[in-house]
Amino acid sequence: MPRSKNDKNIISLYALLIGATIMNFLPSIAIQTFGGIIFFVTFIATYILRAKHDVETDHYAHCSYIIKTIWIFSLLFTVGLIISIGAADHSAIINIVDAIQTGAIPTEQQMMDAVLQFGKDNLILFLILFLPMVIYLFYRFAKGLNIILKSKPAIALKGWL
């Protein structure tokens, strides 16, 4: 059965969000920034697309599901970020800040080394706080994408999972 334009739009939203999320884990600030922009623009596009559908349609349900997923993820991410600010070992960053305050100008390599050391020092904390959120995000996107690809009714998109 050929897919409608609306189905293709929803599939594109899921694909863009999954792709943007993956891009945010690649080791390049430029790619991560581009991924963040794609994620944000797709989020806005989801609101716009949802406004074009009646509340009773599957397409409206998919858009609402995507929006709810992103808002729940954002809330969990913010809580995790607040916890990590208080619980993280900031010694690598503090050393660079102290050097700057004494008049030293750290090289780009020294700055990068401090950021990498900060990541190494806090890897377990970051995994505990953020990995469940990322798994939740991918699970929800994969579930929604699977439902539309199999042409199932969007009634299965209710709830937190």
Descriptions of predicted regions:
Residues 2-161:
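Alpha-helical membrane insertion/targeting regions
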